[in-house]
A protein has these predicted regions:
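Membrane-helix interfacial "entry" motifs
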Residues: 3-7
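N-terminal export/assembly leader peptides and their processing motifs that target proteins to secretory
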Residues: 28-158
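C-terminal juxtamembrane segment of a hydrophobic transmembrane alpha-helix
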Residues: 8-38
Length: 158
């Protein structure tokens, strides 16, 4: 007869523990589900963010005196890109990037923008030098922001 109350206490304890465990599991699942959803949104934005070099890669004019060149990059994706958020590497060197005649322009699908790329260090190339040009762009929209980078071998015309 004395076992009834202790069994009832054990049953209640088991139910409370089971309730706490299920709450933790549901909370964890919700967090994981939200993370997967955010990752999916990011992948969609990345897939819609694209850019292409439309300058002739076999004849990019390079100025050894001013350490600069002019390139044309086209938005070949389906969403608008940020003109001010572009990164360019030339032969592994970070370049400063300035859009030319792009004031008030929305860098939407199909639009090509002229950029001047300039090195802060002395880069001297000979005519016909082949180097890697890497361009990174990001979407104009945020939360999440789509990103894309392209790398091409270009020949410098000095």
């Amino acid at each position: 007869m004395g076992d009834g109350p202790s069994e009832m206490i054990m049953l209640m304890t088991g139910l409370i523990v089971a309730g706490l465990v299920s709450t933790v599991l549901l909370s964890t699942w919700d967090t994981m589900s939200q993370g997967l959803e955010n990752q999916g949104d990011l992948e969609i934005k990345d897939a819609k963010t694209r850019a292409s070099l439309v300058s002739d890669p076999s004849a990019i004019s390079w100025d050894n005196t001013d350490d600069r060149a002019t390139i044309f990059i086209q938005n070949s994706g389906t969403i608008s890109l940020s003109i001010d958020d572009i990164c360019v590497l030339l032969d592994g060197n970070t370049m400063s990037v300035t859009p030319i005649d792009a004031a008030g322009v929305t860098w939407s699908k199909g639009v090509a923008i002229k950029f001047q790329i300039e090195s802060s260090t002395d880069l001297t190339f000979t005519d016909g030098t082949e180097v890697f040009l890497t361009v990174g762009v990001s979407s104009l929209s945020t939360s999440p922001t789509g990103t894309y980078s392209l790398t091409e071998v270009i020949r410098l015309d000095v």
